[in-house]
A protein has these predicted regions:
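Mature, well-folded catalytic/scaffold domains that follow N-terminal targeting or propeptide regions
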Residues: 1-213
Length: 213
């Protein structure tokens, strides 16, 4: 039930959907076994993600959850694969920065388009097809919100291609937990999306890893 609430209501850049989906995958791999305390913790984690976002997460929106968001220029996705392919191939992001006293996660919000779409694809593979359409609609909203741009500056362009399939990637000294989180999603999508070019995908997203400390 908590996952359904997260699916139908965008919050914290899709974290509740991501947490819930990973939990379902673990339960599936464990043949339904899950200690009560872990189940309680997962539900709390999803509930926190649903209830505790800050309303001005996206630049240009004072209360994005209660404002109308025009998604007319975002494609209508029929499947999670379509959505995920769009997300990995359309990454135009700016460095995170403070504007008038508020810190905005510009590139952070865009990388979560990828992790959110990957979670929806995983949900489909787990058999939860009833959750896909509302999930895709909330992802469209997230994509639109993440396209907000700072008043100054230019999009960040990655300087090198960083590859999570290479050992050197895992030797990088990075504290940001999104480093491995994004690597998981990108690795999963490269393996599960047909008709994409691995080098193109990695070039599109490597800037995210460069911006992590």
């Amino acid at each position: 039930n908590q996952l359904e609430e997260n699916i139908h209501n965008l919050s914290t850049a899709g974290h509740g959907v991501i947490y819930g989906t990973l939990a379902l995958k673990a339960i599936n791999q464990l043949n339904g076994w899950l200690p009560k305390e872990i189940k309680t913790g997962i539900i709390k984690l999803q509930k926190d993600a649903y209830e505790n976002d800050f309303p001005n997460r996206y630049f240009g929106y004072k209360d994005y959850q209660n404002e109308r968001v025009d998604v007319s220029n975002i494609p209508q996705f029929n499947t999670p694969k379509e959505a995920a392919k769009y997300c990995v191939l359309n990454q135009k992001y700016f460095e995170n920065q403070e504007i008038e006293g508020t810190h905005y996660f510009f590139h952070g919000n865009q990388l979560h388009d990828i992790t959110h779409s990957q979670a929806l694809l995983m949900l489909e593979k787990l058999g939860y097809k009833n959750l896909l359409q509302p999930g895709l609609e909330q992802l469209r909203k997230q994509i639109k919100l993440g396209q907000s741009q700072p008043p100054k500056g230019t999009p960040y362009i990655g300087k090198t291609q960083i590859n999570p399939f290479h050992m050197q990637f895992w030797e990088r000294k990075v504290n940001d937990e999104h480093h491995n989180k994004l690597a998981y999603s990108i690795s999963y999508l490269i393996k599960n999306l047909e008709g994409i070019n691995e080098s193109e995908v990695l070039s599109n997203v490597s800037g995210h890893w460069e911006l992590m400390n």
